[in-house]
Amino acid sequence: MKTTINNKLGVITVALLLSGLVPSTMMAQDKVEASIGADLVSGYIWRGQNLGGVSVQPSLGISYKGLSLGAWGSVGVESKDAKEFDLTIGYSIGGFSVSITDYWFDKTYTGDVDEYGKEIYTTNKYFQYGAYSTAHVFEAQVGYDFGPLAVNWYTNFAGADGVKENGKRAYSSYLALSAPFKLGGLDWTVDLGMVPWETTFYNGYTSGFCVTDISLGASKEIKITDSFSVPTFAKVTVNPRTEGAYFAFGLSF
């Protein structure tokens, strides 16, 4: 569930979540390429959902001839924020991309509070893969970047997916549209995200098709010295489903 503002897997050039997530066009290269980085964000907003406050989000990726493997994480400064660790394998050629992501959080909110009013969380084990006990969520993605518009479809196919009202697996899905443009010396992106059918995975509960993410983001490199600059980004997000609104800022290193 990658950066609050930028694409969750920009570091490995495959689309993915949190806030979030739009693929970039990747041409197959003839040599192995590796990347490492980290974002510092004022809030972790993923697909129109608030997943935490101030967070550090490291990333590590390697790619070769369109095939990529990446790791991404998020650690919030508040103790109640869950630590996230994601692994993604993907392939892209031209504007087409496909990937599989394994999302994992170290704890899950039970929905209850203790006698002092504090939220109660359960601790999750990483190597626990039971069908009804795992904290992993496995998601498949397919998309195409047309240049003026990028279209991506995501579906949870295994793990701790949401359910329908009848208790059956929802195969929770998400459709994301993204359009980049330049204005006033900044790189802008308009994002539109939709949940196509019933699930408890997004927004607590979604009874059917709904728009859950309308975002406008911008990025720019701030020059510190002649040889050093810091990429910055900011994004305004509204979620019509929950009537939530968020504004987040981040730095990339």
What is the predicted role of each segment?
Residues M1-E33:
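Cleavable N-terminal export/targeting peptides
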Residues D30-V32, G52-V56, S63, D81-F85, ...:
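Residues that define the transmembrane beta-barrel architecture of outer-membrane proteins
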Residues G37-Y44, L67-V77, V98-F105, K125, ...:
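Transmembrane beta-strand segments that form the barrel wall of outer-membrane beta-barrel proteins
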Residues G48-G53, K80-D86, T110-G117, A160-K168, ...:
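Outer-membrane beta-barrel translocator domains and adjoining extracellular loop/strand segments
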Residues L69-S92, S97-G130:
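Surface-exposed loop and membrane-interface regions of Gram-negative outer-membrane beta-barrel proteins
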Residues K118-T200:
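Detector for outer-membrane/organellar transmembrane beta-barrel domains
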